[in-house]
Amino acid sequence: MKRKTLVVIALLLCVVAAFAQDDFKPKTVFLVRHAEKEDEPRQDPPLKKEGVARSQELARFLSAAGIKTIYTSQFARTKLTAEPLATKLGLTATSISLKSNPTNPRLIAEESTAEVVNKIMERPGENVLVVGHSNSIPDVIKMLGGDVVPTIDERKFDDLFIVTVYAKGKAKVTQMKYGAE
């Protein structure tokens, strides 16, 4: 009798735990740094020829990944990196304005990163692409619950991070390369 009661209690706990998950559906978030950019104008440069080629390679590489939403920063280089994939998928990329950290302008303000993560989490079960910057992608991965938070070299443009979010604050990060080096 005790064994039967324990089994029933265990089953009830499993059911309660399942409902306590807030119907969270796993999602995959693809994150890339913008493609290679021109040196001028310094404020908001477009992509170099190599960057345009890389953005087209990204579109080819991710076209079958089931991406439903694309987020970029307000800068031309992120929008131009996302544009070929958005066009191929019939999507419009959503731009999120990133603000600099007041104590260190080379870093992104935490509230900007939180806004990106909140937008991602508003899309349960959807695969999302985020095109960002070397100083924003690691923070987004960390806030998604990534188990590995990379440092992105300023001279590298070929990293693709795939973050599988299993539950709030629990995620697995896979890093791979795409396009030519």
Give names to the regions the model predicted:
Residues 1-23:
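Bacterial Sec-dependent N-terminal signal peptides
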Residues 23-124, 137, 143, 148-181:
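Active-site-proximal alpha-helix that buttresses catalytic centers in soluble enzyme cores
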Residues 131-133:
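Short beta-strand segments
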